Amino acid sequence: MKQRRRHVKPKQKFVERVLEFTIESMDSMGQGVAKIDNKPCFIPKTLPGEEGKAILTKASKGVMFARLASLDITADNREESACKHFESCPGCHYLHTDYQSELLYKHQALDNHLKRLTAPVPVVKVVPAEERLGYRNRIQLHYRHKYIGMIDG
């Protein structure tokens, strides 16, 4: 008896498109979140209140991901990164903002996660580090296909 062949739809080629955005909030990973077509769009290296253009890199039914192309309006708390590798390295997520804002965003992310718990949670204080840079002593390498290292999306 012959087996039937499955009909497999050919994959549609993903088309990158330019998006105009206004960042409304930050997620827990330090990415700016904008609403585009009523879907959340995550754009790394952006801050709340910023407006500009981004290039769509991935989209699914309920969420989009994009990379920053240009900023038309920047946030007041945006700073030049102190690390020369910030643009290409996926390690640090908040070096484009001042340290007080970084602590605030991290505190908000922690609060949002803790609010989802059913048990009451005490107020947690975020303690600033003595040094903002130069304290890391390990890295996490990523693997994709045959490549290992710091792989950017």
Q: Which sequence ranges carry the predicted segments?
A:
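Non-catalytic accessory regions of SAM-dependent methyltransferases
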Residues: 1-153
